[in-house]
Amino acid sequence: MKDKGVIVHFCGVVAMIFWGLSFIWSTQVFSYLNPTTTIFFRLIISCIFLGLLLFIKDRTSRKFAEAEKQKEVRIKDNLKLFAIAALFEPFLYFIFESYGLLNSAPVVSSAIIATIPLFTPIAAFFILRERLTRWNILGFIISFLGVIFMLLNKSLELTVSPKGIIFLFSAVFVAVGYSIALRKLTMLYKPLTITFIQNIIGMIYFIPMFFIMERISPSNIAGISNYILPLLSLGVFASSVAYTLWAYAFSKLGASKANIYSNLIPVFTAIFSCIIIGETINIQKILGILLVIGGLILSQLKINNK
């Protein structure tokens, strides 16, 4: 049992490492492709990768094949739930996150995204009528102050575009909706199946937007050698491996405990931003990250002890 618990926590940490890196990979790709094209190709790569995994697993296990045949009907029965989940994430979430990142810096973007666990209990209070404690509220205030601390300079002026802030917080709200939909899906399907189905539906959502945005803002598809590696990394590691690992951790730990891992995203992003793209991390950003993480831990610890 202890070994299984270690595996669950390991999956959560690895997922956050890949998502921390995804902010850097996206920044690299955005130098050549517009966000919509990046997301569309990212989902195509993910669907191909996950499809191959499912095919190999199907070939190597008859029991798995029989189980999947039985689950085909169940997937059709819950197609509306899959469609809603995919609308939240990857479709809307990727749009807001990508355009937010385009108008911000990786570390600041990841710190805002890390506030998702703060808004989850607030949404649960209104939608699921779950109790909202004073520790939820206190943690929310502290973390929010941390985000503001990172967004303002000494003259109290914004260090990033207001447009980027709006996009990123929109991504946070969408992710909260996705967490609520995912809660039911993890009780019915395996993590790999959930990730595969939601990415296929998400890719379908992006098809018309891809053709519209390519006409408005053409991408530099010709220079593929300059961005193929980070693009493949987004599709394989961020959209496939990370989502599958996190869905597994989510199914074992529940929403509150699983969302705690989001605290690690800005930490990993800050570390890898310095190493890979040479982003400067000053004391103000470090203090902001610490406030965000401190507030998140404060709000979650009391929930878990209840």
Annotated model-derived regions:
Residues 1-40, 158-184, 306:
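Glycine-/small-residue-enriched transmembrane alpha-helix faces in small-molecule transporters
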Residues 16, 39-41, 94, 108-115, ...:
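Helix-helix packing/entry segments at the starts of transmembrane helices
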Residues 17-20, 24, 86-91, 95, ...:
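Hydrophobic/small/kink-forming positions within alpha-helical transmembrane segments
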Residues 18, 22-23, 54-109, 113, ...:
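Specific transmembrane alpha-helical segments of multi-pass solute transporters/efflux pumps
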Residues 24, 50, 120-122, 126, ...:
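Transmembrane alpha-helical segments that form core, pore/gating elements
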Residues 24-35, 101-102, 151-161, 213-226, ...:
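Membrane-interface helix termini and inter-helical loops of multi-pass transporters
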Residues 49-57, 97, 116-141, 267-287:
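C-terminal transmembrane-helix exit sites in multi-pass transporters
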Residues 50, 132-153, 206, 263, ...:
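Hydrophobic transmembrane alpha-helices of multi-pass small-molecule transport proteins
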